[in-house]
């Protein structure tokens, strides 16, 4: 398996499976080493304050079992930093290594997954994993295709956050739609910050959030699931990040976000709305702002990126999140060993929607991508000393 690393200078590598301990419990090793998720973060500068509590705060946002709308599966997602940080919680410049042990290694939930190992679960990666890895694929809890894999990303994203915080760059994500119930349009950064995590689904529109929550309760009773939309805003990103051809900033961010299993669509700024506008309406008008001493834009339909390069305005992204594929309603599928068409009812613990737990994963991946782009941009400018310095002020 390849493709477990993201980034060029600020590089994140993850490994581990959802329920690795289920295989290793009979080995003569301590229970703590049965299995878990690991994140290795390379390119972390020295001198950054980084505590396990700081990383844990991010992990707790996506941890299951916190509310009645979550899967009831209990995982502490407790993180341990085992390298790259000294006793004073200051980074050394060496790779930061983190492990999140699997608490749940043998229970009814895992046993049910084992009983389904021969069949393809609709909407999941079972069939494609069979085609690519055959009988050797980890088929308990979807292995590397499991949503639990994202816990390692969130841990790595917390490291990126610790660095970005020193630069005044903030990334915030929130739910704007659940199963067709939409929050108000154009939620501002200020509104999102003021109402951040004020309800179980992290929707800044507090009134619409009530409708969304009731819908999720109804869907959960049915044993079904629904999708939705998550929006991400990055504030404080300087102009100049990204490359103009194959490595456009929006391409890097799309790579980061579309690598999350449940994400099925993405748009920046006005996105598909540009198809309904004239050029005179679509264009963001630039002007010199004396108060800030730099060029600003009267609107932000571009979503903070022009020509593949950040323009200094808020970067705004929306992603489409598909329904949780594992549901309790009987579904038709295929037994890959007998090649029989069968019907299976997946009575395992699942979320009625992934949206309330995926937003911290979106935050993490955007932070990782932005910090990597920032490193590249700063390195490029450092060796381009013949560029007129006045442009740096704008």
UniProtKB/Swiss-Prot annotation:
Its cofactor is FMNH2. Keywords: Amino-acid biosynthesis, Aromatic amino acid biosynthesis, FAD, Flavoprotein, FMN, Lyase, NADP. Pathway: Metabolic intermediate biosynthesis; chorismate biosynthesis; chorismate from D-erythrose 4-phosphate and phosphoenolpyruvate: step 7/7. GO terms for cellular component: cytosol. FMN binds at residues 144-146, 307, 322-326, 349. One of its GO terms (molecular function) is chorismate synthase activity. Its EC number is 4.2.3.5. NADP(+) binds at residue 62. This reaction introduces a second double bond into the aromatic ring system. This is Chorismate synthase. The gene is aroC.
